[in-house]
């Protein structure tokens, strides 16, 4: 049992590793370089933004290793959530790292080059690891200590920040310099304010303190007349948001570097310790001019609360002379009935198509089942004046012993099933006519009394000369097609390849209604009505409401009806 647990554990560990090798990730061609200071703790975020609503996960790898960086916090280099931790950074940590974002449908990765730097000789920092920031002369602005928001404690507070200039402590006199959290406010910027500013703090991790240092290259730029900032987004708009969802609102401004861009809600600025709202700042210098920047302040809403629908979120940009604003109003999502309608229409269409296909394939079985199951519940039909359900028209034998299979089918098998098992009433010439009756009168009278005309076809009947040339056939087909409008059913006892030799009327009937082919034998034994031939024939017959005469009635080839003498089944009156 213990060995089985070990084996299952190994399988669970191997499956994710194998899947990592199999997956092919799309790589973003970003040229991202991170400079870290040796022997300092550092935390860096993946440049790719995961979508937690889609189940995105982030995994870090070093170099080309297929093994993810450990999530064990005792490891000097480890991953916590989507962040990569160096506790502390060493020179040998330099190299490139892959950040991979994946879910069940896609995989993205980006390459991050990490360089761990030692301090330059005679300095308390490395000049390669500086972050340039610019302020206008004679204006007010602020220097922001970059990439330190990850060091907030459980109360969402940063450690105390100490400021230095050119490695010497900076005097915060509250006249020219003000220290506010991770920002250094500079009043009335002057040329002599140029230099390298260091923001330093101590961060405690697992009971041990580590230094955190950032170097800002403060560059002064000439005084210039301020241009009015332009808010590109939002534009006084509304956004649908689901309650409890996580969304981002972006304030995109084109203006000066010193323009302040921030969000307000319900008349107040966003508090730094708000449990649901957090701001993130970005700026990008315009390539066309060094005096204009794209300033982006992102408001991250971790959970949309009901009160957020009451008041708009206001994007504010201001400088010493100008104040601009635009708002975003959150609204509840409007139900999208379009998708439901499309889905319902597709389902309905698919259902109809399936039903039509099923009906076409099983049409005969469905109709017969309906007749057998529901005929007793339907109201009785008014009499149509017909006596017979079908008149059987077949080639007459030329002498005794000829066409014995045909006679067996006509006088034995056909009545046995249709009359004996299903109660149909057939008129068969040679069985139901009386001695001495005129053929023309018998045919004319009984075709009119029949609901169907069943024509039986066989091969080798002298080019089918019997069809349409004798008086009986002519009268029967004429009455069925022209005078009475009776439905005609063609039965092939043998496969007939060439219908061109047949009369046009037969060709027309075959083309319009098709033909039913016999597939059984001619043994004189009880027939099963469940074969395809008998089902197709019953389908062409009228709906039967009478009970069958006998489900196992066997007919002889010389039937006697009532007390009158009938003609022998194998001998018939000559036609015409």
From Swiss-Prot:
GO cellular component, one term: cell surface
Reaction catalysis annotation: NAD(+) + H2O = ADP-D-ribose + nicotinamide + H(+)
Keyword set, alphabetical order: Cell membrane, Disulfide bond, Glycoprotein, Hydrolase, Immunoglobulin domain, Inflammatory response, Membrane, NAD, Phosphoprotein, Receptor, Repeat, Secreted, Signal, Transmembrane, Transmembrane helix
Main location: membrane
GO biological process terms on file: cytokine-mediated signaling pathway; inflammatory response; interleukin-1-mediated signaling pathway; positive regulation of canonical NF-kappaB signal transduction; positive regulation of interleukin-1-mediated signaling pathway; positive regulation of neutrophil extravasation; positive regulation of phosphatidylinositol 3-kinase/protein kinase B signal transduction; positive regulation of platelet-derived growth factor receptor signaling pathway
Signal peptide: 1-19
Record-annotated TIR domain positions: 386-541
Record membrane topology: Single-pass type I membrane protein
Posttranslational modification: A soluble form (sIL1R1) is probably produced by proteolytic cleavage at the cell surface (shedding).
Residue intervals on the Extracellular side: 20-338
GO MF annotations in UniProt: interleukin-1 binding; interleukin-1 receptor activity; interleukin-1, type I, activating receptor activity; NAD+ nucleosidase activity, cyclic ADP-ribose generating; platelet-derived growth factor receptor binding; protease binding
Outcome (variant: residue 134 to K): No effect on interaction with IL1RN
Disulfide cysteine pairs (residue numbers): 25-107, 46-99, 145-199, 251-315
Protein location: Membrane; Cell membrane; Secreted
Residues where Phosphotyrosine is found: 499
Active site: 473
EC main group: hydrolase
Subunit-level organization: The interleukin-1 receptor complex is a heterodimer of IL1R1 and IL1RAP. Interacts with PIK3R1. Interacts with IL1A.
Its biological purpose: Receptor for IL1A, IL1B and IL1RN. After binding to interleukin-1 associates with the coreceptor IL1RAP to form the high affinity interleukin-1 receptor complex which mediates interleukin-1-dependent activation of NF-kappa-B, MAPK and other pathways. Signaling involves the recruitment of adapter molecules such as TOLLIP, MYD88, and IRAK1 or IRAK2 via the respective TIR domains of the receptor/coreceptor subunits. Binds ligands with comparable affinity and binding of antagonist IL1RN prevents association with IL1RAP to form a signaling complex.
Entry comment, domain topic: The TIR domain mediates NAD(+) hydrolase (NADase) activity. Self-association of TIR domains is required for NADase activity.
Protein name: Interleukin-1 receptor type 1
Species in which this protein is naturally found: Mus musculus
Gene name of the record: Il1r1
């Amino acid at each position: 049992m213990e060995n089985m647990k070990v084996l299952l554990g190994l399988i669970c560990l191997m499956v994710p590793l194998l899947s990592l090798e199999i997956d092919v990730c799309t790589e973003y061609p970003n040229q991202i370089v991170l400079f870290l200071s040796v022997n300092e703790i550092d935390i860096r975020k993946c440049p790719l933004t995961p979508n937690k609503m889609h189940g995105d996960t982030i995994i870090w790898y070093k170099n080309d290793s297929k093994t993810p960086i450990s999530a064990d916090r005792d490891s000097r280099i480890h991953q916590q959530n989507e962040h990569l931790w160096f506790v502390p950074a060493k020179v040998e940590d330099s190299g490139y790292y892959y950040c991979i974002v994946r879910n069940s449908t896609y995989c993205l990765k980006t390459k991050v080059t990490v360089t761990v730097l030692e301090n330059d000789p005679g300095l308390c920092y490395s000049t390669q690891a500086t972050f340039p920031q610019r302020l206008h002369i004679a204006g007010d602005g602020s220097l922001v200590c970059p990439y330190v928001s990850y060091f907030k404690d459980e109360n969402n507070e940063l450690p105390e920040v100490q400021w230095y200039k050119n490695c010497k402590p900076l005097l915060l006199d509250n006249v020219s310099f003000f220290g506010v959290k991770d920002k250094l406010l500079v009043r009335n910027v002057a040329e002599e304010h140029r230099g390298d500013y260091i923001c330093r703090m101590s961060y405690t991790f697992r009971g041990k303190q580590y230094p955190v240092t950032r170097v800002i290259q403060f560059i002064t730029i000439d005084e210039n007349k301020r241009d009015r900032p332009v808010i590109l987004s939002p534009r006084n708009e509304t956004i649908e948001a689901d309650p409890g969802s996580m969304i981002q609102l972006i304030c995109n401004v084109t203006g000066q570097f010193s323009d302040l861009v921030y969000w307000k809600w319900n008349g107040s600025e966003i508090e730094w310790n708000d449990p649901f709202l957090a701001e993130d700042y970005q700026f990008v210098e315009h390539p066309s001019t060094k005096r204009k920047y794209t300033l982006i302040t992102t408001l991250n809403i971790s959970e949309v609360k009901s009160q957020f629908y009451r008041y708009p979120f206001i994007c504010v940009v201001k400088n010493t002379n100008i104040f601009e604003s635009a708002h975003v109003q959150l609204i509840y999502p409007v139900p999208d009935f379009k998708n439901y309608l499309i889905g319902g229409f597709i389902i309905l269409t698919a259902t109809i198509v399936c039903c039509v296909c099923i009906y076409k394939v099983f049409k005969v079985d469905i109709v017969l089942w309906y007749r057998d199951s529901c005929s007793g519940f339907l109201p009785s039909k008014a009499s149509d004046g017909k006596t017979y359900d079908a008149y059987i028209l077949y080639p007459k034998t030329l002498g005794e012993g000829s066409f014995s299979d045909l006679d067996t089918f006509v006088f034995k098998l056909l009545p046995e099933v249709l009359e004996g098992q299903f109660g149909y009433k057939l008129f068969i010439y040679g069985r139901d006519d009386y001695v001495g009756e005129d053929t023309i009168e018998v045919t004319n009278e009984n075709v009119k009394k029949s609901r169907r005309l069943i024509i039986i076809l066989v091969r080798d009947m002298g080019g089918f000369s019997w069809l349409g040339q004798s008086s009986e056939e002519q009268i029967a087909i004429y009455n069925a097609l022209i005078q009475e409008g009776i439905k005609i059913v063609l039965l092939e006892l043998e496969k007939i390849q060439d219908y061109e030799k047949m009369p046009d009327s037969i060709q027309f009937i075959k083309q319009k209604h098709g033909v039913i082919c016999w597939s059984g034998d001619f043994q004189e034994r009880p027939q099963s009505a469940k074969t395809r031939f008998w089902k197709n024939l019953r389908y062409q017959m009228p709906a039967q409401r009478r009970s069958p005469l006998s489900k196992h009635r066997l007919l002889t080839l010389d039937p006697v009806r009532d007390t009158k003498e009938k003609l022998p089944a194998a001998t018939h009156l000559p036609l015409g």
